[in-house]
Design a protein with these regions (language model features):
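Intrinsic, low-complexity N-terminal interaction/targeting segments
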Residues: 39, 79, 114-120, 124-129
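Glyoxalase I/VOC metalloenzyme domain signal
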Residues: 1-6, 10-32, 47-113, 131-172
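Short linear motifs in intrinsically disordered
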Residues: 46-48, 118-119
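N-terminal beta-loop-helix "entrance" segment that forms/cooperates
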Residues: 39-46
Length: 172
């Protein structure tokens, strides 16, 4: 099973400030910000969840960087599972998989269970969080490889290659 890390994600308290800091400290960027991402459906620890989050996506060397903030007060979420609203730190790495259920079974066989499964409302992206905290200290996000996701990753990578470092944020 190909489980190459495609993204590293940090929970942050202020997305734009975090983007600026990642640029200044590590030359990461530029960033596209998706605000108030809603879910079509979601389940966390076997219970329905409808958290709202915002994410900034940028390039950090050869890997995508996500800076994520939960925007609502939901408590049953993969973000509140690890961090309070003002706390920051690594939340997950992400891998694209060929088959979601097979990936879940693979991780489960190593005592890393599926904690969260959701579908975004607008883009209809299915994703899940594997609880790898006992083994790695953070979660693993999984989603099935798709043209939509591959195109988005390529867009972010291309923007980084063409970046003149005059503008930290870009839109699509």
């Amino acid at each position: 099973m190909d489980l190459e890390i495609s993204q590293i994600a940090y929970h942050v308290s202020d997305i734009r400030t975090a983007c600026k800091n990642m640029y200044l400290q590590f030359a990461a960027g530029p960033f596209i910000i998706s605000e108030n991402i809603e879910l079509a459906n979601g389940e966390h620890r076997g219970k329905k969840t409808q958290f709202v989050h915002s994410s900034a996506y940028g390039q950090w060397g050869n890997i995508m960087l996500e800076l994520v903030k939960q925007e609502d007060n939901s408590v049953n979420t993969p973000f509140r599972e690890m961090y309070g609203p003002d706390e920051e730190g690594i939340h997950h790495t992400a891998v694209m998989v060929e088959n979601f259920d097979k990936a879940v079974a693979h991780f489960d066989s190593f005592n890393m269970p599926l904690l969260t499964r959701c579908t975004t409302a607008k883009a209809h992206v299915d994703f899940g969080f594997i609880d790898a905290r006992k083994k790695l200290g953070y979660m693993i996000e999984i989603y099935e490889r798709s043209t939509t996701l591959l195109d988005f990753y390529q867009l972010v990578k291309n923007r980084a290659k063409e970046w003149d470092q005059k503008h930290l944020f870009f839109s699509v």
